[in-house]
Amino acid sequence: MKIDLVKAAEKDAELIHRMQVESFREIYLKYKDDETNPINESVEKIVQKLKRSDSHFYLIKFENDFVGGVRIVVKNDHKRISPLFVLPRYRNKGIAQAAISKLEEIFGAENWELETISAEKINRHLYEKMGYRLDGKATIINDKLTLVFYRK
């Protein structure tokens, strides 16, 4: 799978916002999560994240189109993926897996963490296939949604 990660800038905040809304809409409707779902992030909040010195936001490019995004927060030698998203029409093509592999080439393959929805088996399978393991922590967001935490 050939993808490129293009470093996002402040000018990309509206594009990121539109892609997040489209990418997370189905999850939002399913779990009614007003607290943590990126669909609720404003463009201004995305700009703030883009400006942070510990934050690296990338647009995922596939066949000349931006098809998603991923943000990495680096603290010391620990890296956290939050969020990773691919537009619905580009899913199940290996794009997220290719993006994670590229990130590990850029930032190193160790000391990663992320969270995902416990009930989303496709996401969990992806992360486990990439070598991530549950760390035993979980956070209940509401009666429909529990987040589980992974490390690598």
Briefly describe each language-model feature range.
Residues 105-118:
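Conserved GNAT acetyl-CoA-binding A-motif
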Residues 21-47:
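Conserved GNAT-fold acetyl-CoA-binding loop/helix
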Residues 97-98, 102, 119-136, 142:
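Conserved active-site alpha-helix within GNAT-family acetyltransferase domains
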Residues 84-91, 116-118:
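A short, internal acetyl-CoA/4′-phosphopantetheine-binding micro-motif in the GNAT/acyltransferase core
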Residues 3-18:
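A short beta-loop-alpha structural element at the N-terminal edge
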Residues 59, 65-73, 80-85:
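Conserved beta-strand in the GNAT
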Residues 81-82, 92-103:
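Glycine-rich acyl-CoA binding loop
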Residues 45-59:
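A short helix-loop-beta-strand connector motif used in the catalytic cores of GNAT acetyltransferases and
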